[in-house]
């Protein structure tokens, strides 16, 4: 009887041979993996109760009964576990044996179907066939969650690691390739479930919560000329009760359940790390009760020593009902992380790099200027090309917005040059936040924020460092926008009350720059703009497509982090609105800025030229010559950019040798069309989009995509805690205007300038929330994958791309050595500055934690 069953299952072919394989998988919850392993292996020989089946699909032998698609092998089932690959705490992976029947006619397998008859999902990492006769090893990279088969409308299929352009796909695999893409696209209807793998687009209509009152209504971003925006992933949640155009939100406590395609969800380690961050966001709801934690004035730091106690001595937590309730609701290990306790109930943060060597160097003019080149937002500064600076705002709506800075304000600081001479010698630069803020400033200043729109002029000195010349602070005219602005110009001083006023002027600039950094440089220009590329790549490029294989690592965790951001960070009354000066207008402002977003300008050389800090120069190593030679972000960035471009050029050139091959690639053309017309659909008619008609356009576009996702994001993200973890250095909010002579505030500024400074910038409780946020965002998880690394060494079978990738990795190692060398060069004063913080944000690799270095492959935090 058993023999008959076995014969039936294996087909009973006398000429069949056995092909052994290894399956690597992990259960959904590492902690109960042992249970799954026992259930899979303990009954493996119970023929009628086997739970996971595999069927190979031939790439050479057709099945006439199946529309001439590749023939399926007989089902094979998991055998005894072979070994556990990693420790339990790191996400245990277990290898199982599997044995297939095979014959000569079947040839080389190109894909396989898996069916999960178990009651729960598991993570399938890979299948390796050890020795297919006449073909050797065949490897399938899977990295996918497989749910019980009842959850799927079609079979789960995985392809071997041999890439194919659509026209080169073996005929017997083409239908499988096409059907898999159809599955991933879905039909645009219905609410998405946890097991779904569907990628689709939607507008940002889920940031507000109109069901909770008018104060929680937020502008829909995307789908309009007034507020254009990149698209996000569709969840299919129902509309709100009060506004059918707004998508309903899920409860805060279920934030981590927000839908993204299943394989886009964080891995075990990443989710564990992010859960801690989610818990921190809950603290915002109990902040009003936390003032009992502090001595002195409630919600105020009384001195810089008060601030420093956050990092050095710590703050004693009260053993009251609030603390007990919090610790009862949260596991001990998470409360330790959440509240930075050491077992003694002490709230303490790591010392930020900017105050590690010196507690006061951050206040120097040199450091203030240096951070525009090597800080957390080194992508804004531009060369001054007209004096006085002129506004591009419509004078009909906003009146005269041109700068009131005159030559008299600055010429005594130009080392003997006139303004014209300094400009002609490329010596004058500007940090300009004026035009962005003015249209919103009147509304922003009706909130707790009281701030200005700023312009900062800087002079490039002979030693390569910048010195600030003047700061202009502007407010909308009290009589109306059409009357322009009222402005005041401040110049450097180190004497008396004028010195304190200058420190405050720099603080207002830092507030402007901090908000622009979080809103534009970070969220919009990396997180938001890359998500449509993630969606389009999965919808239009098969996993068999070489460009899918090229780009896939650079999309890891992006949809999940963005979905969580919509849920707890950038939503109405979320952490972002609670900690930045733009408050509830923040995201709407980013939509206005997106109007000027140009994809080709995101390429680093193009960006540097556009900002006037570099000029095109074919004789220079990277095709551009920097006008600020000691510009750490640009110097290191150009090295990274060139390495990425060389790698992408080698890779794409292997698959595309002519324009014709680009044009006839139907998947590639559909991908680019969808990106333009849907993913970034509000900008579909822009003339600057590459046509995707030549290999060079493909190379340039892929290089830019990888740059945005990896190095650009690293440069603007992982410096947050090193520089903004000490809030006085980069305050996120200013709460009162510059003190005027004759007022009590002015007298306080004269008598106690430090206290006046601290009463102007971010309040104590906001500081705690803000520091907690940037600490989490600046940390690398222990499972991070960095530029030049891959999750699997067998990500492709093609040898030449593997060799090119190896060269890319070696080039990045060389760049690391060059960065270390430059940081040790005392002549390059901007590399470390007065705070002695070497520039390492574009150092390719890192270990886990708060390191201030490392370029992850993707926008993953």
UniProtKB/Swiss-Prot annotation:
Residue sites binding Fe cation per the record: 522, 527, 713, 717, 861
Cellular component terms per the entry's GO annotation: cytoplasm
Tissue specificity comment: Expressed in tubers and roots. Not detected in leaves, flowers, stems, shoot tips, or axillary buds.
Single GO BP term: lipid oxidation
Cofactor binding, per record: Binds 1 Fe cation per subunit. Iron is tightly bound.
Reaction(s) the record says it catalyses: (9Z,12Z)-octadecadienoate + O2 = (9S)-hydroperoxy-(10E,12Z)-octadecadienoate
Compartmental location: Cytoplasm
Matches recorded under PROSITE patterns: LIPOXYGENASE_1, LIPOXYGENASE_2, LIPOXYGENASE_3, PLAT
Span of domain PLAT: 33-160
Alphabetical list of Pfam families matching this protein: Lipoxygenase, PLAT
CC cofactor: Fe cation
Gene3D superfamilies (alphabetical): 3.10.450.60, Lipoxygenase-1, Domain 2 (4.10.375.10), Lipoxygenase-1, Domain 3 (4.10.372.10), Lipoxygenase-1, Domain 5 (1.20.245.10), PLAT/LH2 domain (2.60.60.20)
Entry EC number(s): 1.13.11.58
Alphabetic keyword roster: Cytoplasm, Dioxygenase, Fatty acid biosynthesis, Fatty acid metabolism, Iron, Lipid biosynthesis, Lipid metabolism, Metal-binding, Oxidoreductase, Oxylipin biosynthesis
Keyword check for Metal-binding: yes
This protein's pathway: Lipid metabolism; oxylipin biosynthesis
Residues covered by the Lipoxygenase domain: 163-861
Enzyme class: oxidoreductase
GO molecular-function terms, A-Z: linoleate 9S-lipoxygenase activity; metal ion binding; oxidoreductase activity, acting on single donors with incorporation of molecular oxygen, incorporation of two atoms of oxygen
Record region (Disordered): 220-247
Job description of the protein: Plant lipoxygenases may be involved in a number of diverse aspects of plant physiology including growth and development, pest resistance, and senescence or responses to wounding. Catalyzes the hydroperoxidation of lipids containing a cis,cis-1,4-pentadiene structure.
Assembly and oligomerization: Monomer.
Family designation: Belongs to the lipoxygenase family.
Name of this chain's protein: Probable linoleate 9S-lipoxygenase 3
Native source organism of the sequence: Solanum tuberosum (Potato)
């Amino acid at each position: 009887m058993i023999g008959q069953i076995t014969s039936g299952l294996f087909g009973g072919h006398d000429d069949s041979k056995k092909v052994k394989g290894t399956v690597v998988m992990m259960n959904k919850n590492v902690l109960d993996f042992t249970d799954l392993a026992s259930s899979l292996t303990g009954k493996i020989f119970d023929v009628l109760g086997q739970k996971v089946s595999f069927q190979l699909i031939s790439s050479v032998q057709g099945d006439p009964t199946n529309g001439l698609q590749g023939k399926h092998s007989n089902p094979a089932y998991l055998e005894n576990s072979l070994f556990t690959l990693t420790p339990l705490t790191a996400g245990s992976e277990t290898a199982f044996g599997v044995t297939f029947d095979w014959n000569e006619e079947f040839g080389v397998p190109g894909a396989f179907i898996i069916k999960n008859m178990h009651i729960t999902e598991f993570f399938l990492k890979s299948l390796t066939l050890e020795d297919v006769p006449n073909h050797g090893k065949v490897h399938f990279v899977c990295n996918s969650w497989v749910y019980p088969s009842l959850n799927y409308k079609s079979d789960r299929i995985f392809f071997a690691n041999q890439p194919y352009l659509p026209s080169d796909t073996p005929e017997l695999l083409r239908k499988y390739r096409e059907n898999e893409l159809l599955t991933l696209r879905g039909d645009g209807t219905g609410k998405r479930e946890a097991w779904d793998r569907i990628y689709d687009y939607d507008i940002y209509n889920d940031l507000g919560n109109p069901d909770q009152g008018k104060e929680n209504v937020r502008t829909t971003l995307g789908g309009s000329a007034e507020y254009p925006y990149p698209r996000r992933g569709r969840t299919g949640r129902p509309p709100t009760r009060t506004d059918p155009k707004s998508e309903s939100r899920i409860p805060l406590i279920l934030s981590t359940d927000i839908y993204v395609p299943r394989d886009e969800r964080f891995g075990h380690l990443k989710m564990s790390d992010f859960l801690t961050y989610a818990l921190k966001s809950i603290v915002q709801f109990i902040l009003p009760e936390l003032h009992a934690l502090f001595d002195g004035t409630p919600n105020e730091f009384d001195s810089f020593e008060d601030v420093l106690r956050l990092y050095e001595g710590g703050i004693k937590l009260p053993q009251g009902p609030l603390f007990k309730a919090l610790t009862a609701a949260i596991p001990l290990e998470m409360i330790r992380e959440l509240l930075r306790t050491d077992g003694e109930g002490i709230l303490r943060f790591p010392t930020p790099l900017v105050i590690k060597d010196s507690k006061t160097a951050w206040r120097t003019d040199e450091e203030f200027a240096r951070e525009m080149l090597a800080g957390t937002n080194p992508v804004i500064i531009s060369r001054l090309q007209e004096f006085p600076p002129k506004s591009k705002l419509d004078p009909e709506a906003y009146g005269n917005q041109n700068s009131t800075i005159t030559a008299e304000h600055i010429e005594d600081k130009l080392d003997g040059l006139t303004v014209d001479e300094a400009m002609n010698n490329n010596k004058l630069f500007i940090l300009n936040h004026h035009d962005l803020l003015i249209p919103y400033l009147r509304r922003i200043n009706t909130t707790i924020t009281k701030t200005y729109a700023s312009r900062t002029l800087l002079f490039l000195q002979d030693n390569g460092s910048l010195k600030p010349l003047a700061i202009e602070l502007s407010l909308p005219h009290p009589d109306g926008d059409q009357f322009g602005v009222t402005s005041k110009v401040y110049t450097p001083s180190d004497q008396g009350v004028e010195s304190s006023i200058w420190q405050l002027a720099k603080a207002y600039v830092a507030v402007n720059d901090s908000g622009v950094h979080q809103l534009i440089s970070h969220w919009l220009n990396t997180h938001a703009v890359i998500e449509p590329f993630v969606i389009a790549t999965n919808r239009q490029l098969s996993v068999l497509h070489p460009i899918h294989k090229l780009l896939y690592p650079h999309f890891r965790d992006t949809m999940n982090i963005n979905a969580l951001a919509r849920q707890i960070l950038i939503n109405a009354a979320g952490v972002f609105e609670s900690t930045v000066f733009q408050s509830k207008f923040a995201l709407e402002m980013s939509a206005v800025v997106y109007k000027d977003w140009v994809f080709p300008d995101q390429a680093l050389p193009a960006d540097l030229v556009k900002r006037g800090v570099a000029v095109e120069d074919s004789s220079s190593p990277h095709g551009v010559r920097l006008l600020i030679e000691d510009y750490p972000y640009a110097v290191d960035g150009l090295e990274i950019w060139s390495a990425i471009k060389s790698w992408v050029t080698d890779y794409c050139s292997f698959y595309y040798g002519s324009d014709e091959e680009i044009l006839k690639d139907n998947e590639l053309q559909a991908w680019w069309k969808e990106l333009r017309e849907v993913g970034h659909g509000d900008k579909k008619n822009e003339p600057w989009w590459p046509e995707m008609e030549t290999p060079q356009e493909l190379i340039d576009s892929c290089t830019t995509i990888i740059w945005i996702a990896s190095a650009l994001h690293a440069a603007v993200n992982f410096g947050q805690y090193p520089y903004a973890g000490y809030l006085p250095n980069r305050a996120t909010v200013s709460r009162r205007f510059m003190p005027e002579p004759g007022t009590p505030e002015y007298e306080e500024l004269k008598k106690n300038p430090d206290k006046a400074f601290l009463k102007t910038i971010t309040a104590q409780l906001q500081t705690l929330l803000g520091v907690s946020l940037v600490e989490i965002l600046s940390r690398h998880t222990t499972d991070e994958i960095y530029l030049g690394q891959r999750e699997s060494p067998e990500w492709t079978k093609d040898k030449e791309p593997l060799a090119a990738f190896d060269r890319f990795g070696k080039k990045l190692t060389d760049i690391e050595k060059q960065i270390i060398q430059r940081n040790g060069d005392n002549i390059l004063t901007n590399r470390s500055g007065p705070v002695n913080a070497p520039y390492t944000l574009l150092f390719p690799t890192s270990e886990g934690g708060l390191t201030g270095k490392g370029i992850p492959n993707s926008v993953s935090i």
